[in-house]
UniProtKB/Swiss-Prot annotation:
Name of the protein: Non-specific ribonucleoside hydrolase RihC
Domain of life: Bacteria
GO molecular function list: purine nucleosidase activity; uridine nucleosidase activity
One GO location term (cellular component): cytosol
Family statement drawn from the similarity comment of this UniProt entry: Belongs to the IUNH family. RihC subfamily.
Organism: Escherichia coli O7:K1 (strain IAI39 / ExPEC)
EC number, as in UniProt: 3.2.-.-
UniProt-annotated catalytic positions: H233
Pfam family membership, one: IU_nuc_hydro
Function: Hydrolyzes both purine and pyrimidine ribonucleosides with a broad-substrate specificity.
Length: 304
């Protein structure tokens, strides 16, 4: 039986790969997509998500979400993904539109209609998820679990300690981690290992139309290089859903720093139990890289 999922995203070049996997992995049933400001503005992430859905002829409803963090000024990662968020490929025009309600309400409505609890997957800042949990707490029993790409037990990638998705909206992340729902965190500890090799990247143009499109995007992606390999951060959250045996997880207490002058956005991961607090997150710490690369090749071969 396919696993029903809702995907909250901020496309983003590596988001595009994660979306492809969510659509084409035969184990998954992607029922709803929502967008959030992150890699670029929410207007751009929404446009990019709709372009991808049209490219794959995927009839999946999409709702536009939060344009700004809960309390902070927005920031983006255009230096990594290009000003449009998906630089490098010219998508054809279409007339698709997002749903007419905010993302968190679209998630609420879809959860309440679902015949069974649904897995939420968040691969951008957690603003929409925090709004859902704070404004619609009655939805919690309908959430099977939340799988996120975000955080780190060690080094950051936008500050010395903070990972980008958490650092964009630390208050939202703090709200989510305090919520009591089941959380799996695929952070930089594993996503920095999730590298597609130059040899594999070179095969993409001959793979299928998705391979050609992704190869064009990857030439503008600045998380690695075509010569040294590219990190597939967001794809790890989808990979865990399909191939959890590729990941080593540890239950930990995780809190988000919201006050520090130099540490705001840091995920404080208590690996050794120093704080004597109950674990609230399953934290991915190791990845079977070869197994991950093999799975990516398999799923992208299906993305025609």
């Amino acid at each position: 039986m396919r696993l029903p999922i809702f995907l909250d995203t901020d496309p983003g070049i590596d988001d595009a790969v994660a979306i492809a996997a969510a659509i084409f992995a035969p184990e998954l049933d992607l029922q709803l997509m929502t967008t959030v400001a992150g890699n670029v503005s929410v207007e751009k992430t929404t446009r990019n998500a709709l372009q991808l859905l049209h490219f794959w002829n995927a009839e999946i409803p999409l709702a536009q979400g939060a344009a700004v963090p809960l309390v902070r000024a927005p920031r983006d990662a255009a230096s990594v993904h290009g000003e449009s968020g998906m630089a490098g490929y010219d998508f054809v025009e279409h007339n698709r539109k997002p749903l007419g309600i905010p993302a968190f309400l679209a998630i609420r409505d879809a959860l309440m209609r679902a015949p069974e609890p649904v897995t939420l997957v968040a691969i951008g800042p957690l603003t929409n998820i925090a709004l859902l949990l704070s404004q619609c707490p009655e939805c919690k029993p309908y959430i099977r679990r939340l799988v996120i790409m975000g955080g780190s037990a060690g080094r950051g990638n936008c500050t010395p300690n903070a990972e980008f998705n958490i650092a964009v909206d630390p208050e939202a992340a703090a709200c989510v981690f305090r919520s009591g729902i089941e959380i799996v965190m695929c952070g930089l500890d594993v996503t920095n290992q999730a590298i597609l090799t130059p040899d594999y990247l070179a095969t993409l143009p001959e793979l299928n139309r998705t391979g050609k499109m992704l190869h064009a995007l990857f030439s503008h992606y600045r998380s690695g290089s075509m010569q040294s390999g590219l990190r597939m951060h967001d794809l790890c959250a989808i990979a865990w859903l399909v191939r959890p045996e590729l990941f080593t997880l540890k239950p930990c207490f995780v809190a988000v720093e919201t006050q520090g002058e130099f540490t705001s956005g840091t995920t404080v991961v208590d690996i050794d139990g120093c704080l004597d607090k109950p674990a609230n997150v399953q934290v991915a710490l190791e990845l079977d890289v070869k197994g991950f690369q093999q799975w990516v090749a398999e799923v992208l071969a299906l993305a025609s």
